[in-house]
Amino acid sequence: MKNNSIKAVVATGIGAALFVIIGMFINIPLFANTSIQLQYAVQAFLAVIFGPVVGFFIGLIGHMVKDMFAGYGIWWSWVIPSGLVGLGIGFLRNRLHVEKGIFSTKDVVTFNIVQVLVNVLAWGVIAPLGDIIIFKEPASKVFVQGLLASVANALTVGVGATILLAIYAKSRTQAGSLSKD
């Protein structure tokens, strides 16, 4: 158990650092303060490997630190959904078996259905409502931002994390794959 705790802490730290670095240096603008964010593919990948708690803290800590470095203050209405994305996708840890070298077509479909639903809920609903409640932002603006972020993040995770998970699964040794000559 202690070893798993250490792995979780290390994965959280590395994941949050990658979240910040990728988020600060690799983004493609789409709409007012909304861009394609490649760090969500890495967060989703690590969430599936290490579970919902690690996924949550990668997004929460990573997004918070990224906002601090960006200089415009912490937008909690978007930081919290980043954590929730990792949390939601992380619940797939026990359903998918990439650690055992398995990432079937059914697993790819399951992963992508879940990540699309999680992204739509986080960015299309929770983030815009947070902007309206916390920052008094106009609903017409924030729901457009949320919709664009939902689509961009779902596509980013759908392509990027699916590739990362497939590569990772292929790198694992499947049970019974080794035989004595």
Swiss-Prot record:
It is found in: Cell membrane. Coiled coil: none annotated. The keyword Cell membrane applies. InterPro entries: ECF_substrate-spec-like (IPR009825), UPF0397 (IPR022914). Its main location: membrane. Pfam families: ECF-ribofla_trS. It is a multi-pass membrane protein. It comes from the Bacteria. One of its GO terms (cellular component) is plasma membrane. The chain crosses the membrane at residues 8-28, 45-65, 72-92, 115-135, 147-167. The keyword Transferase does not apply. Keywords: Cell membrane, Membrane, Transmembrane, Transmembrane helix. NCBIfam families: PRK13661.1. Belongs to the UPF0397 family. PANTHER family: UPF0397 PROTEIN BC_2624-RELATED (PTHR37815), UPF0397 PROTEIN SPR0429 (PTHR37815:SF3). This is UPF0397 protein SMU_1935c.
